[in-house]
């Protein structure tokens, strides 16, 4: 397994996704969705180059889709994969990635 790190903002995103899903659907659905997101993170950590380039918005960023969410990654200077954010596809992605 390739090494990856998850930023504080991405952890907050994932936590908020779980809470929203549990409150609006069910804990079981929240757990399933959480696992889908983590599976995508692990896949990209192993296959970084398969993620789509997002450099037109943020230099060196890539993303991959996990259901209705986009998982944003970059490589660190130590060649680790950093999960930067996990955002819903209908959010204002550009502004969310700036903050």
Regions found by a protein language model. Give the residues of each.
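Arg/Lys-rich, positively charged N-terminal/basic patches that mediate binding to nucleic acids
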Residues: 1-34
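Short proline/glycine- and basic residue-enriched helix-capping loop/turn segments at helix->loop/beta transitions
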Residues: 42-46
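Basic/aromatic recognition patch in beta-strand/loop cores that engages polyanionic ligands
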Residues: 49-78
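Enriched for short, Lys/Arg-rich terminal
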Residues: 74-99
């Amino acid at each position: 397994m390739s090494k990856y790190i998850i930023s504080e903002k991405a952890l907050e995103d994932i936590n908020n996704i779980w809470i929203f899903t549990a409150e609006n659907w069910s804990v079981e659905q929240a757990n399933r969705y959480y696992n889908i997101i983590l599976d995508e993170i692990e896949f990209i950590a192993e296959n970084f180059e398969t993620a789509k380039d997002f450099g037109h918005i943020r230099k060196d960023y890539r993303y991959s889709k996990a259901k209705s969410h986009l998982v944003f990654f970059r490589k660190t200077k130590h060649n680790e994969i950093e999960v930067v954010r996990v955002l819903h596809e209908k959010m204002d992605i550009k502004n969310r990635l700036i903050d």
